[in-house]
């Protein structure tokens, strides 16, 4: 192999998958700083990819154990929006295929918005079935947030295009005859729950951005309905909306004044 330019070396390293590759051995002997920097970057990327693979395998253990028992339709369930002062609580139920693989999958709160959006599209493309449950602020006020979250989760399961044989749920138990396991911090421990958390988060964020367009003075597209200083000041200045949860403090206290 003739001596390559730094740019050519970069392209080569994108193709090279193993240190055993003859081209890699030649680049290793290239003493130019630019090439050595690229090799160092290649090693770091390989190390990150290996860590992501190990994390993904660790997060697949619940699903794999159930598949070994002959189950196919395993639904991961998670919610987003229990804490905000405005907007709905949104849940998702996701059934993934056996060969599903998205390295870097994690709890939606730990991912950047760009990564969440990309993973959302990939999950949509690969999933066997996805169901979403949405419960309005009015119903939250009527039955309380805990019951509303349960209801949204049951709705998400009902909206699946297949009947799940088992449920993996993030920190909740559901009144359903379908066998289930409740996993604390499940969105970081199960790929199905993690996928559900991403679907729920992106779905709710998009709804809140639409609310932001409808009520530009409130900044919903920034705080997603949570009780930030900006949001509380907007409520003081412009009033309480129908999208606000009247049973949540401090809105409840504002109404009683």
From Swiss-Prot:
Record CDD domains: RNase_HII_bacteria_HII_like (cd07182)
Domain called RNase H type-2: residue spans: 72-257
Keyword Cytoplasm assigned: yes
EC number assigned by the record: 3.1.26.4
Essential cofactor(s): Mn(2+); Mg(2+)
Natural source organism: Bacillus cereus (strain AH187)
Protein name as it appears in the record: Ribonuclease HII
GO cellular component: cytoplasm; ribonuclease H2 complex
Family: Belongs to the RNase HII family.
GO molecular function: manganese ion binding; RNA binding; RNA-DNA hybrid ribonuclease activity
Positions bound to a divalent metal cation: 78-79, 170
Organismal lineage: Bacteria, Bacillati, Bacillota, Bacilli, Bacillales
UniProt-listed SUPFAM superfamilies: Ribonuclease H-like
Catalyzed reactions: Endonucleolytic cleavage to 5'-phosphomonoester
Keywords: Cytoplasm, Endonuclease, Hydrolase, Manganese, Metal-binding, Nuclease
Localisation per UniProt entry: Cytoplasm
Primary localisation category: cytoplasm
UniProt cofactor note: Manganese or magnesium. Binds 1 divalent metal ion per monomer in the absence of substrate. May bind a second metal ion after substrate binding.
Entry-linked PANTHER family: RIBONUCLEASE H2 SUBUNIT A (PTHR10954), RIBONUCLEASE HII (PTHR10954:SF18)
Listed GO biological process terms: DNA replication, removal of RNA primer; mismatch repair
Record's function text: Endonuclease that specifically degrades the RNA of RNA-DNA hybrids.
Protein's UniProt keywords contain Ligase: no
């Amino acid at each position: 192999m003739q001596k390559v330019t730094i740019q050519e070396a970069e392209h080569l390293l994108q193709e090279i998958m193993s240190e055993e590759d003859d081209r890699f051995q030649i680049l290793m002997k290239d003493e130019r700083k630019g090439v050595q920097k690229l090799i160092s970057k290649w090693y770091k990327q390989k190390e990150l990819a290996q860590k992501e693979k190990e994390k993904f395998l660790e997060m697949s253990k619940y699903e794999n154990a159930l598949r070994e028992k002959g189950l196919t339709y395993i639904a991961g369930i998670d919610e987003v929006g229990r804490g905000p002062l405005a907007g709905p609580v949104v849940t998702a139920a996701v059934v993934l295929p056996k060969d599903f693989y998205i390295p870097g999958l994690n709890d939606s709160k730990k991912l950047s918005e760009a990564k969440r959006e990309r993973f959302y599209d990939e999950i949509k493309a690969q999933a066997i079935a996805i169901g979403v449950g949405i419960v309005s602020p009015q119903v939250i006020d009527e039955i309380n947030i805990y019951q509303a979250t349960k209801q949204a989760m049951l709705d998400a399961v009902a909206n699946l295009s297949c009947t799940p044989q088992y449920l993996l749920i993030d920190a909740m138990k559901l009144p359903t005859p379908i066998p289930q396991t409740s996993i604390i911090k499940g969105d970081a421990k199960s790929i199905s729950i993690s996928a559900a958390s991403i679907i729920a988060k992106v779905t709710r964020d998009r709804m809140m951005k639409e609310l932001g367009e409808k009520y530009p003075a409130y900044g919903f597209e920034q705080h997603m309905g949570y009780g930030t200083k900006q949001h509380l000041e907007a409520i003081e200045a412009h009033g309480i909306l129908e999208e606000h949860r009247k049973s949540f403090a401090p809105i409840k206290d504002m109404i009683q004044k």
